[in-house]
Amino acid sequence: MRVTSLLWSSLVIPAAVGFQVRFKPSEDTALDTVDDGTLQSLLDNIGLNGSNAWDTRPGLVIASPSKKDPNYFFTWTRDSALVLKCITDAFAAGNTALQETIHEYISSQARIQLLNTRSGGLSSGGLGEPKYRVDETPYNEDWGRPQADGPALRATALIAYARWLLENDYYDVAKSIVWPVVKNDLSYVSEHWNTTAFDLWEEVNSPSFFTTIVQHRALVEGINIARALDETCPHCESQAPQALCYLQSYWTGTAVRSNYGQGRSGLDVASILGSIHTFDPEGECDDTTFQPCSARALANHKAVTDSFRSIYKINGGIKQGEAVAVGRYPEDVYFNGNPWYLATYAAAEQLYDAMYQWNKIGKITVTDVSMPFFKDIYPEVQTGTHESSSPEFGNIIAAVKAYAEGYIEVAKKYTPCTGMLSEQFSRDNGTPLSVADLTWSYASYLTVMARRNSVVPASWGEKNARDIPSTCVPSSATGPYQTATITHWPPNLTPTAQPSPCPTALPTKNNVRFRLLATTQVGEDVFLVGSIPELGSWDVKKAVPLNADIYADNCHQWYVDIELPTAVAFEYKFIRKRGGEVVWEQDPNRKYTVPQTCGVSGAIKRDTWR
């Protein structure tokens, strides 16, 4: 994703992620009961409290802790917004520990909006600046700028929180603190949606399907949230239909052409990302908005994933209709053009989204456009509408589910034993490549696992925004910009009602497995010591020893299971002992809060010795 760009695979339950189950899973859907640590790995990359981001400004999301070969130690508007949308959905569903992170993010974005950059100032195009330094100063070197998807995605993330505030009777906070930041982004989108910008991979300066589709969603949500706040957004109202109209131009008849130029086919996982990030659980299989279950989106899924079948060595021998490793686009040459974890998870997520929609509307319609997709995974399929009461409905769902699970298994197969996600994995042997601990990757894993368990975000209003206007014209509209100054957040913004009540009392104890990747010598042992009594209160003589019984040549992993009180925050470090010598790992201290989530009986914290 950056002239470059911006996964692992373990299991996380909906409660641990914190989303709300809005559609009851089938009886054979097994929900996981252990927080696998992915959410914590994501939070570790957010300043100021994240263990990988302790030297960043509060609320800033770093793309990766990597500072060289390549350097991703910056904050990107797009990536940050996608990560915060994931966090905000989790918070809205009951994970209240995430609220401070959301507040710090919104405050940081209010400050960043005011920076003068090479893209401009607040009202002169500056919101299209793609990335910033972690001290909230501009990045003034050459880059692919402007990028117009960031403001749209940020507006969507902030609107999700504003919606929660309204639902919990905090109207004044939504209107006075969140709305001014959102309003600036909406003004940028309405003014610039019809202008050329760099795509999400920061390589092609052309119209982009991903950018247009997320801009359309943001404008629609802008209309709705403005009304809820007794505000108006006439520039949203005039431009949303036109953006939808333009969105249709990316459809070729068989697939989405994601962008133009540089001799590409236009097949790009960005189109699948566009569908999943505009998925509406209340929507139907609408072609105009490329909903995940639409004929267009399914045909495109086949076209995009098929484009990687023959070009990656690790996909060799995999039959048509079976899941494969997925990259960005087949002509990719960055790091030699490899599969990406987030791309492979996106291919799975669209299928889970589609199954949710089919179950919700109670039917599956197979058309000439979508037939090739269905035929690959269920050769007996016939065109027509298959009602949920029919055997064919169940057969198709089973086939799609198996296909989706296949993509999860592909990503798992090439994930290291630590579960820590890099950006890419080798097209030849599956070895993780490029930067480690990619924040967007962790977010993509959390969302695909949520969808896998029929856990979905709130509707964005697609049902009332899918009709193409009778007259389509290239246009733009200027909206107001204003300085959004956030000096403080009111205390005690607690939920007035839990959206998904816990059927039992919240746990007071949680068994936490600390997993450490550390290369050691014979006779050397590793210990855990920290600020709470259970970890020795920083006394090395009371440090907790780690086990090495799963340490192997290809996985230098130590671990220990410790029962800890829930909701307790503490600091800790790992130490090595050999004879009478004690070696501490480098500063700073690590930080962790023991999860206290409905239904979660265990958690995993993943670390690497430093």
Swiss-Prot record:
Active site positions: D199, E202
CDD domains assigned: CBM20_glucoamylase
Propeptide feature ranges: 19-24
Superkingdom per UniProt: Eukaryota
Keyword Secreted appears in the UniProt entry: yes
Occurrences of domain CBM20 (ranges): 504-610
Disulfides per UniProt: C233-C236, C245-C472, C285-C293
Binding residues for substrate: W143
Record field: catalytic activity: Hydrolysis of terminal (1->4)-linked alpha-D-glucose residues successively from non-reducing ends of the chains with release of beta-D-glucose
This protein's UniProt keywords: Allergen, Carbohydrate metabolism, Cleavage on pair of basic residues, Disulfide bond, Glycoprotein, Glycosidase, Hydrolase, Polysaccharide degradation, Secreted, Signal
Extent of the signal sequence: 1-18
Compartments, record wording: Secreted
InterPro entries assigned: 6-hairpin_glycosidase_sf (IPR008928), 6hp_glycosidase-like_sf (IPR012341), Carb-bd-like_fold (IPR013784), CBM20 (IPR002044), CBM20_glucoamylase (IPR034836), GH15-like (IPR011613), Glucoamylase (IPR000165), Glucoamylase_SBD (IPR008291)
Induction cue: Expression is up-regulated in presence of human keratinocytes.
SUPFAM superfamilies (alphabetical): Six-hairpin glycosidases, Starch-binding domain-like
GO MF annotation list: glucan 1,4-alpha-glucosidase activity; starch binding
Protein name, entry field: Glucoamylase ARB_02327-1
Organism: Arthroderma benhamiae (strain ATCC MYA-4681 / CBS 112371) (Trichophyton mentagrophytes)
